[in-house]
């Protein structure tokens, strides 16, 4: 092999190694910043009721559901708050330290992002409340439809519309 080809081969190999290292670092960075979305039922039972697809303790996840009435516990000396979130199935406990959104209240839909510190306890770094009574995050809406359709619950049941509201609409 002549010297010219050797130098070209070295340059090509150097570029390939550099691109490979850069790609590996990008993939590693993306992997550590991806937060998977779960419903409380999926945290407890695993996605599609498959225990092998449960999130692991220490994993960063996002959980969406409704704040269980009567479950909000506030520490009077700090900004620590603890509350339960559920869909139709089991609940999980969310622990958060900070100022909650103005729209946060019991019975309200929320999305909490954080780290799972126990199989059913999420240490939240961020809590988001939905902005009006009919809004459901797209991911939560899809998950709720998957969970509720087999149970025979209609989409109107998921909107939170009462029987009285439905009767008033029908009478108009």
Swiss-Prot record:
It comes from Actinobacillus succinogenes (strain ATCC 55618 / DSM 22257 / CCUG 43843 / 130Z). This is Cytochrome c-type biogenesis protein CcmE. SUPFAM superfamilies: Heme chaperone CcmE (SSF82093). Keywords: Cell inner membrane, Cell membrane, Cytochrome c-type biogenesis, Heme, Iron, Membrane, Metal-binding, Signal-anchor, Transmembrane, Transmembrane helix. It is found in: Cell inner membrane. One of its GO terms (biological process) is cytochrome complex assembly. It is a single-pass type II membrane protein. The lineage of its organism: Bacteria, Pseudomonadati, Pseudomonadota, Gammaproteobacteria, Pasteurellales. Disulfide bonds: none annotated. One of its GO terms (molecular function) is metal ion binding.
């Amino acid at each position: 092999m002549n010297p010219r080809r050797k130098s070209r081969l070295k340059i090509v190999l150097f570029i390939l190694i550099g691109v490979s290292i850069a790609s590996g670092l990008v993939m590693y960075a993306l992997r550590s910043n991806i937060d998977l979305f779960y419903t409380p039922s999926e945290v407890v039972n695993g996605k599609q009721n498959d225990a092998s697809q449960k999130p692991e303790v220490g994993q960063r996840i996002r959980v969406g559901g409704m704040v269980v009435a009567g479950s909000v516990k506030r520490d009077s000396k700090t900004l620590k708050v603890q509350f339960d979130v559920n869909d139709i199935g089991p609940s999980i406990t969310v622990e958060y330290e900070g100022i909650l959104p103005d729209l946060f209240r019991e019975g309200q839909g929320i999305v909490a992002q954080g780290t799972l510190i126990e199989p059913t306890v999420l240490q939240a770094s961020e809590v988001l409340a939905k902005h009006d009574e009919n809004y459901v995050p797209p991911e939560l809406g899809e998950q709720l439809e998957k969970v509720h359709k087999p149970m025979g619950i209609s989409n109107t049941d998921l909107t939170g519309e009462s029987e009285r509201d439905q009767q008033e609409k029908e009478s108009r």
